[in-house]
Amino acid sequence: MKYYSTNKQAPEATLEEAVVKGLAADKGLFMPFTIKTLPQEFYDSIDTLSFQEIAYRVADAFFGEDVPADTLKQIVYDTLSFDVPLVRVTKNIYSLELFHGPTLAF
């Protein structure tokens, strides 16, 4: 799959190029030209899935064409091995606290 810059002023990139570069030459973010649609079954059963399984299925929609399923699953489960609390902000708004991971980055 090819990736484009959100600023649309840089050459297309492969997944490897996008990951290694981080940002496109025009300072845009790399996005895939197409993202596989998640099936309705995913949404119907999302409340029964672990955070890691949800992340894997979403990552597969972005990268599945370029990364073998078992490799992608291993990457997701290794990198998201920490608790992610779901915190109520207001009556109908919740937030995932992603900053509890080892890098405190999110």
Regions found by a protein language model. Name each.
Residues 1-106:
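PLP-dependent amino-acid enzyme catalytic core
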